[in-house]
């Protein structure tokens, strides 16, 4: 498994970086309401593929039009806004540890008239004081990637990557689905990081495969897991 020890720390893993980025994006949005900020992995169309995956699998496990959905590391909330435009009309919640992210996403929700359907909360998902409740679907689009670059230790000992699956298990209902997209980890690495006795790989999303130096691979991967108990 590629753990955090194998990844260099980066400013992308710091709260300061994201606070400054989303503060700037909020300022830009206030000047121009059409500018809602960047969409991660847009070059791979990952967000739309994740949404299409959920729509295509309605009826499987806890995936339904009324499913409760939480987006970990929601950023500007773009994925939830897009998801709300589909069949999904259940409780949609975005979580981020950046206060500026929550301000930006909340402002966009209010300006677009969906603040009664989508809510955003600032939280440290690794804190024992966090009381998130449980959801039918948990989403992650690049959040584990950013977290893995932070160099953070839980209780000064455990890498955040090593406890991430426990966070997901904590907030996911039985038969719930965790859908994650990553550019830092391969599909096999994600399975090793996320799979537990209760969380098992279910399906994957296909992306274009490239060949370089005789080796085939994709620049991004998305894996869905189901919580069995």
Swiss-Prot record:
One of its GO terms (cellular component) is cytoplasm. Pfam families: Methyltransf_31 (PF13847). Disruption phenotype: Defects at both very early and later stages of endocytic transport in cells. Keywords: Cytoplasm, Methyltransferase, S-adenosyl-L-methionine, Transferase, Transport. The keyword Membrane does not apply. GO terms for molecular function: protein-lysine N-methyltransferase activity. SUPFAM superfamilies: S-adenosyl-L-methionine-dependent methyltransferases. It is an enzyme of class 2 (transferase). It is found in: Cytoplasm. GO terms for biological process: methylation; vesicle-mediated transport. It catalyses: L-lysyl-[protein] + S-adenosyl-L-methionine = N(6)-methyl-L-lysyl-[protein] + S-adenosyl-L-homocysteine + H(+); N(6)-methyl-L-lysyl-[protein] + S-adenosyl-L-methionine = N(6),N(6)-dimethyl-L-lysyl-[protein] + S-adenosyl-L-homocysteine + H(+). Its EC number is 2.1.1.-. Belongs to the class I-like SAM-binding methyltransferase superfamily. EFM4 family. S-adenosyl-L-methionine-dependent protein-lysine N-methyltransferase that mono- and dimethylates elongation factor 1-alpha (TEF1 and TEF2) at 'Lys-316'. May play a role in intracellular transport. Present with 1620 molecules/cell in log phase SD medium. This is Protein-lysine N-methyltransferase EFM4. The gene is EFM4.
